[in-house]
Amino acid sequence: MKHHFGDLLDRTDDYWTTVPNIERYAYLADKEITDKELVKVLTIGKEQKHWEQVFECPHLEELTLHSPSTEQVQALKELPQKLKRIRITFLRTKDIEFITALKHLEEVIFEYVSGFSDLSPLRQLIRLKSLHLENLRRVSNFGGLEGINSLRYLHIDGTLDWNQPIDNFNFLQRLPNLEVLSLRFVINRTPFPAFLPILGLKKLRKIKIGRATFNTKEYAFLQAALPNVEGCNWDLYWDYNDNYEFLGKGAGRVGKKNPKAKVRCDEFETMFNDMKKEAEEIIKQNRFE
């Protein structure tokens, strides 16, 4: 699947200042730049003959690498140390060690980056506040994110035709300042309660999770664990296309005109409340200090 170029970044608060995806081409380094002192945003890729100008822009703050060459990626360590934001799209690489040279990065976006599996080099970015990971084909273990104490916003995503696997969510309990957790088109590989580590996130303000991404019991757990967190108020049954769609992956539906529709919805609500009670007991036994 080719990149959508949609802007999936949460523009509330100060999490993201990276230019929207569709605007990346407005900053192409495809011709000679006359006043390099004024340049703060650039886009380069293997098609840009004048890409080396990037080293002559002393005030560069943001860089997009769109289908970059190996030479361009390896040259990142030579960039001005004022670089705060980077977006890399369509890259195959054996590792992401190159990112460690960019110590001042605050916002990092990886889209369609494949060939590597270890995210731990990101730990070297001690100012990293926002991280967007989309369609990382070789990654399933996100333990490499543990210990990024500056991280406030995390988005993990797949695509319409491929779901990003996540082995477990243990890494969450070692992201002490995380405020926003966003999960889209993902596959959970951990049995219930997969989100137990989320109890350690004392600063979490918002979660963004689709209503059919996880088993119903996981949604019940999240509601019980995060009663005051924005995004945990999913409708138990959603009015959609003449049906009531029940909350949870594979939870089913009932036609609105079905004479037993109300009974089915009431039964689901009762079941969900029982799940929340079970979750509350688990939380009492496992609450992180």
Language model regions located:
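Concave beta-strand-loop units of leucine-rich repeat
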Residues: 2-96, 101-117, 121-288
